Amino acid sequence: MSIQVFCDFDGTITNNDNIMSIMEKFAPPEAEEIKQKILSQELSIQEGVSQLFRLIPINLHDDIIQFLQETAEIRTGFHEFIQFINENNISFYVISGGMDFFVYPLLQEIIPKEQIYCNATDFSGEFVEVKWPHPCDEQCQHSCGLCKSSLIRKLSSKDDFHIVIGDSITDLQATKQADKVFARDFLITKCEENRIAYTPFETFHDVLAELKHLLEVKL
């Protein structure tokens, strides 16, 4: 049995949800209604996020990149967590509903690109179009966009010990496949609603301490 860690990006590795930060800064007011429909599950994640980015003109690309470079912050303890992961040969994947144009640059000096799974974007039209290279498999019908539960099935085996780290509705389906869940913010609410056991965290020092405990006691 091997340990497989699957970690969200926006609001988990980074302090803020970068998609929501982009929308608050650059999108028109109607983005807020779409956001609420995603959180309430009135809209699927795929449809909702597609609608959000179709509100963003492509000529804002450089402004968005500069904005994220100035505002995106990596959560405290993440570098130490990754160092421990690497030293102990634990498999680690970023499974992110975020977009390639900001996920890859923000992680380029920390995580190898081949360990990062995220959505793609097309800036060739008038507005940003999201592409979905990691859709739901036959076992998931939730229109996740980037389907985290499908990626877990693809990248690991049932015999592995699955750890999921996340913060929001986009991580909910993945938690249902996890042996251990680390949750913060809105994901805590969804775990409690669905009676999914979780460990709360605010920094990756919290996650690292619990992971060390798991290695010593359970695994």
Curated annotation (Swiss-Prot):
<keyword id="KW-0028">Amino-acid biosynthesis</keyword>
<comment type="pathway">
    <text>Amino-acid biosynthesis; L-methionine biosynthesis via salvage pathway; L-methionine from S-methyl-5-thio-alpha-D-ribose 1-phosphate: step 4/6.</text>
</comment>
<keyword id="KW-0378">Hydrolase</keyword>
<dbReference type="GO" id="GO:0043716">
    <property type="term" value="F:2-hydroxy-3-keto-5-methylthiopentenyl-1-phosphate phosphatase activity"/>
</dbReference>
<comment type="function">
    <text>Dephosphorylates 2-hydroxy-3-keto-5-methylthiopentenyl-1-phosphate (HK-MTPenyl-1-P) yielding 1,2-dihydroxy-3-keto-5-methylthiopentene (DHK-MTPene).</text>
</comment>
<protein>
    <recommendedName>
        <fullName>2-hydroxy-3-keto-5-methylthiopentenyl-1-phosphate phosphatase</fullName>
        <ecNumber>3.1.3.87</ecNumber>
    </recommendedName>
</protein>
<dbReference type="GO" id="GO:0019509">
    <property type="term" value="P:L-methionine salvage from methylthioadenosine"/>
</dbReference>
<comment type="similarity">
    <text>Belongs to the HAD-like hydrolase superfamily. MtnX family.</text>
</comment>
<dbReference type="InterPro" id="IPR036412">
    <property type="entry name" value="HAD-like_sf"/>
</dbReference>
<keyword id="KW-0486">Methionine biosynthesis</keyword>
<dbReference type="InterPro" id="IPR017718">
    <property type="entry name" value="HAD-SF_hydro_IB_MtnX"/>
</dbReference>
<dbReference type="InterPro" id="IPR023214">
    <property type="entry name" value="HAD_sf"/>
</dbReference>
<dbReference type="InterPro" id="IPR006384">
    <property type="entry name" value="HAD_hydro_PyrdxlP_Pase-like"/>
</dbReference>
<dbReference type="Pfam" id="PF12710">
    <property type="entry name" value="HAD"/>
</dbReference>
<dbReference type="InterPro" id="IPR050849">
    <property type="entry name" value="HAD-like_hydrolase_phosphatase"/>
</dbReference>
